[in-house]
Amino acid sequence: MTEESHPLRGAGNFFGRRHGKPLRSHQKNLFEDLLPRLKINVENPAPQDLRTLFEAKVDAVRLEIGFGGGEHLHHETGRYPQTGFIGVEPFINGMAKMLAALDGEPRSNLRLYDEDATAVLDWLPDASLSGIDLFYPDPWHKRRHWKRRFVSDANLDRFARVLKPGAKFRFASDIEHYVNWTLQHCRRHPAFDWQAEGPSDWNHAYEGWPGTRYEAKAFREGRRAAYLTFIRR
């Protein structure tokens, strides 16, 4: 995809602060030693066959945007060793947790990126992904910040370009307004169908879902999550 054909990246980043608590020395070492070996270089052209990105022999490739502490992504990479995963997380402390998990249990079917996910989406070849996961993204509560929500017409266009026909876009959130926002955007987009027949389809977590620390905190505070699945036409 050429630079001229990229959808607009919008006004500002889709994520908030990049850094929280100071990193410990071991975490800093992982950023210096492990991340460079796993990080995708979007300055180079993407391979037409994305499966060649991975050390492991894989049959399909999925993308997780904003993986937080990496609980779900690390779980999925172990659960599906023949699927390649690209994980994007710009928050430094979240990436540090993921790198620590990989230091203990390496994954040969995983690549990482620690900056804006739209750069990866614009880098990917057409119809190259078997799935995109976006779980508990920043809801940007204030109305003036809604334009920074990751679910947008421009990003759904990006999803539509890189997803194979029949591939899934999965979205989970505990913020009702963002859930409704996502439903409205996806249902009016010509490339996506909502896969739901009744409340049980969005009130129950995905099969094999490991849960996340953020989700557990939301439940403790009395919020409920919705789990949406959309199919690329």
Swiss-Prot record:
Keyword tRNA processing included in the entry's annotation: yes
Catalytic activity: guanosine(46) in tRNA + S-adenosyl-L-methionine = N(7)-methylguanosine(46) in tRNA + S-adenosyl-L-homocysteine
Protein name: tRNA (guanine-N(7)-)-methyltransferase
Any one Gene Ontology molecular-function term assigned to this protein's record: tRNA (guanine(46)-N7)-methyltransferase activity
Residue ranges, annotated region (Disordered): 1-21
Superkingdom as given in the UniProt entry: Bacteria
Keyword Methyltransferase on entry: yes
Matching PROSITE patterns: SAM_MT_TRMB
EC number: 2.1.1.33
Residues spanning the membrane: none
Keywords recorded for this protein, A-Z: Methyltransferase, S-adenosyl-L-methionine, Transferase, tRNA processing
Family of this protein: Belongs to the class I-like SAM-binding methyltransferase superfamily. TrmB family.
Residues noted as binding substrate in the record, renumbered to the chain: 142, 174, 212-215
Biochemical pathway: tRNA modification; N(7)-methylguanine-tRNA biosynthesis
Species for this entry: Brucella anthropi (strain ATCC 49188 / DSM 6882 / CCUG 24695 / JCM 21032 / LMG 3331 / NBRC 15819 / NCTC 12168 / Alc 37) (Ochrobactrum anthropi)
